[in-house]
Amino acid sequence: MVKIRLTRGGAKKRPFYHIIVTDVRSARDGRNIERVGFYNPVAQGGEKRIELDLARVDHWVKNGAQPTEKVRNLIKEATKSQAAAA
């Protein structure tokens, strides 16, 4: 089964997450199929908080990938922000 989930990066006390498409059997920071965006929960100033390639996310969801609960919320937030920017 394929999932869309977060993989952690960044420094201690300053997390940064990549949003990836991966097999459920892979480790959290292990191999991934595709990187579709990022999430920066501690963004400051002009830094982007979320960047997501919604076309690729939609492609993977149509092909059976299941987003985790947190990623599902991030997709909704990114969709709202892109609609507001347009």
From Swiss-Prot:
<dbReference type="InterPro" id="IPR000307">
    <property type="entry name" value="Ribosomal_bS16"/>
</dbReference>
<dbReference type="GO" id="GO:0005737">
    <property type="term" value="C:cytoplasm"/>
</dbReference>
<keyword id="KW-0687">Ribonucleoprotein</keyword>
<dbReference type="InterPro" id="IPR020592">
    <property type="entry name" value="Ribosomal_bS16_CS"/>
</dbReference>
<comment type="similarity">
    <text>Belongs to the bacterial ribosomal protein bS16 family.</text>
</comment>
<dbReference type="GO" id="GO:0003735">
    <property type="term" value="F:structural constituent of ribosome"/>
</dbReference>
<protein>
    <recommendedName>
        <fullName>Small ribosomal subunit protein bS16</fullName>
    </recommendedName>
</protein>
<dbReference type="Pfam" id="PF00886">
    <property type="entry name" value="Ribosomal_S16"/>
</dbReference>
<keyword id="KW-0689">Ribosomal protein</keyword>
<dbReference type="GO" id="GO:0015935">
    <property type="term" value="C:small ribosomal subunit"/>
</dbReference>
<dbReference type="InterPro" id="IPR023803">
    <property type="entry name" value="Ribosomal_bS16_dom_sf"/>
</dbReference>
<dbReference type="GO" id="GO:0006412">
    <property type="term" value="P:translation"/>
</dbReference>
